[in-house]
Amino acid sequence: PNVWTYYQDNEPVSGILICCRVPENGSPYTRYVDIVTPMPWEKVAQWSDTKVGQRGEEYRAFKERKADECIALAETFIPELGDMVEARFSSTPLTYRDYTATPEGSAYGVRKDWHSPMMTLLTPKTPVPNLLLTGQSLTLHGLLGVSMTSLFTCAEILGKEAVYAITKTE
């Protein structure tokens, strides 16, 4: 399938990405788990004219149902995960739209074309002195893209050697 636009309109959720954060206290267990699933704008378009915190009970129930579906699917890989959840937070494309001002809540920024990757490659440096960019639309999109472009932006400020020295592992 075309992985760049792949989405199955299945109920319940049929695909997730599970990310477990490395514990800072040396514990072999994580305290934080992120679960991500694709969601097209059409799923939340009915609330597009609303604001954060003012979307009503139907929207809250929709988010709760999607969170429950994600956790249930994650439990096929992490048994009893739901029983271990102390707090949970969910977002939709509306959340991304309202907090990041991305069109229709895009979480991945400018669409990249693997046939011609240089066409959408942006650099951190701008023509405006001391104005630098970072984020999902510069080089790589998504969660990893934001992390990588932050390093590119830091390299513009500190120099590549300084960033390499900071990120180098023994």
Q: Which residues fall in each region the model found?
A:
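Mid-domain catalytic core of redox enzymes
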Residues: 1-28
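Short, glycine-/Ser/Thr-/acidic-enriched flexible segments
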Residues: 11, 22-25, 38-42, 115, ...
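Flavin-binding catalytic cores
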Residues: 28, 55-94
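Short acidic/His/Gly/Ser-rich catalytic and metal-binding motifs that mark active-site loops
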Residues: 42-49
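A glycine-rich dinucleotide-binding beta-alpha-beta segment and adjacent secondary-structure elements
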Residues: 76-140
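A conserved FAD-binding loop/helix module that cradles the flavin
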Residues: 118, 136-158
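Active-site-proximal substrate-binding core of FAD-dependent oxidoreductases
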Residues: 159-170
